[in-house]
Amino acid sequence: MNRYGIQFQVKNSPSLDPEFMPILKFNRAFLQSAKKPVSFAVERSNGQVAVCNTFIHGTPDMREADHYYADRLVKSMLWLQGGFKVYVSGDEDVYNYLKETFSLTGKRAFDADFMAGVYEQPFEVVFCDKVPEEKGASQAIGRHMDGCRIGFDAGGSDRKVSAVIDGESVYSEEVVWFPKTNSDPDYHYDGIVAAFKSAAEKMPRVDAVGVSSAGIYIDNRTMVASLFLKVPKEQFDAKVKDIYIRAARDVFGPDIPLVVCND
């Protein structure tokens, strides 16, 4: 198979999509002849940065291949690790291509708009002499067994809550609800609060609350989640983004430890 001047072998060609190209095969063949160093970095929340140091060809005849490789690489970095700011160093032509591609009028407009919404920051692609250094922030989540704790799972068809004392479950409840078809965020809030209160009643106190649900959560805030699919954007911004923070605060006070994570 030849794609953008890059030749590689594909053992099995799917009959329903004979032009399907395994990206790993392309990348391996591409990097065999690419010699010009370039770097890409993607910045996300709290100053965290993902970095990829790699190579392109940097020649007119391989320009299309370079563009394709850079596009797929940056798109993968965005969806694997997230981010709102892309740094490019090493090649201005690739930078210009990515800047146009990941603009609100480019072919990756969805990606740019989505990430801007997730991080509440304008999405941008910038050129620099040297990309920022890699920076992550590990978190110790879970395995806290001491004290009186609540675990809440917000599912699409039911919500589950457990009360745990020193690692032993003393109460569990599963309630059917319909969050994906309800446009009123107060419906979701009331269901979350009801679950918190139900579990809290079975313990002498509540030391911490943990929440799991499908979606993108940053600093315990709901940035994207299918549970709130029908909620209008204005209502989502006003009542959904901080819904778990509000629910925990309203039931247990402002100082309750809370962690919300994608499951």
Segments from the language model and where they lie:
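Structural motif
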Residues: 41-45, 86-93
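Short alpha-helical segments and helix-capping/turn motifs at coil-helix boundaries
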Residues: 69-75, 145-148, 194-197
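Short Lys/Arg-enriched alpha/beta "domain-start" segment
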Residues: 1-80
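Short coil/turn connectors at secondary-structure junctions
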Residues: 83, 146-148, 158-159, 254-256
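Short glycine-rich, Thr/Ser-proximal phosphate-binding strand/loop in the N-terminal lobe
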Residues: 27-30, 36-62, 154-194, 198, ...
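Glycine-rich phosphate-binding loop and adjoining helix at the ATP-binding site
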Residues: 54, 59-71, 77-81, 92, ...
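Short glycine-aspartate micro-motif
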Residues: 85-87, 140, 147-153, 206-210, ...
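N-terminal, positively charged, Ser/Thr/Ala/Gly-biased leader segments
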Residues: 8-12, 22-27, 33, 55-58, ...
